[in-house]
Amino acid sequence: MLTVIEDLLSKKEVTQFTQALDKGQWLDGKHTAGSQASKVKYNQQLDDGSALAIELRNTVIRKLSGNALFMSSALPNKIYPPKFNRYQGGEHYGLHVDASVMPIPNSHQMLRTDLSATLFLSEPKTYDGGELSIETQFGLQQIKLNAGSVILYPANSLHQVNPVTKGRRTASFFWIESLVRSNDQRSMLFDLDQSIQALTVELGSNDAEVKRLTGVYHNLMRSWATC
């Protein structure tokens, strides 16, 4: 399941992010890639230890935590601290699959990567290329969203960032360990939750069938959650 979360950041917030990132310290992205990924990774990455990176990643996490669509679709248990990258002058990230398990920085915890996420910080009209290409069961999906919007997709997907041939593509990226490991089960829970919300608006929260479906949702969560 691919989920688009529009306008996680407002236009004003995007401008604040990009102005701050223009002044940040950028490093060769290969330094943070695994042995296989480093062979196909050509981009720049914001210094993770900088005060700017810490400030911006905290803002992203705060916005995610307050977004109902993100919470419903991802069912997050842990969120890997968001990172920031940029591509320009033909830079790209070749076809790869993200690591299955990652250590969370500055902790003794590990994170299972159930979902990958990209928060676009550049408007599509400001750069050529740079599509996030994801191989799905329905074929190749080419993703290029408005600045401030997020794409969530299964972390076991083969994907790549196409070469940026003009302008600059800046983004934040991160991973989520979900309470529900299975993509299929998580997708069913999301559909059920969206239906419950729609029926609640139409019939009210005290409707017997709304209550029944809500009970089904929570019982499925109880059966499938891995926390």
Swiss-Prot record:
- UniProtKB keywords: Dioxygenase, Iron, Metal-binding, Oxidoreductase, Vitamin C
The reply to whether Ribosomal protein figures as a keyword in the UniProt entry is no
Query: Which terms under GO biological process does the entry name?
Result: DNA damage response; intracellular iron ion homeostasis
- Provide the Fe2OG dioxygenase domain boundaries: 78-178
Query: Which residues are noted in the entry as Fe cation-binding?
Result: H96, D98, H159
Query: So which cofactors does this thing need?
Result: Fe(2+); L-ascorbate
Q: Where, if anywhere, are coiled coils annotated?
A: none
- Can you quote the record's cofactor note? Binds 1 Fe(2+) ion per subunit.
Say which enzyme class the record assigns.
oxidoreductase
Q: Which GO terms describe its molecular function?
A: 2-oxoglutarate-dependent dioxygenase activity; iron ion binding; L-ascorbic acid binding
Tell me which HAMAP family the record gives.
Hydroxyl_YbiX (MF_00657)
Recorded hits in PANTHER family, A to Z, give:
PKHD-TYPE HYDROXYLASE YBIX
Q: Under what name is this protein listed?
A: PKHD-type hydroxylase Patl_2273
**Species this chain originates from:** Pseudoalteromonas atlantica (strain T6c / ATCC BAA-1087)
Taxonomic path: Bacteria, Pseudomonadati, Pseudomonadota, Gammaproteobacteria, Alteromonadales
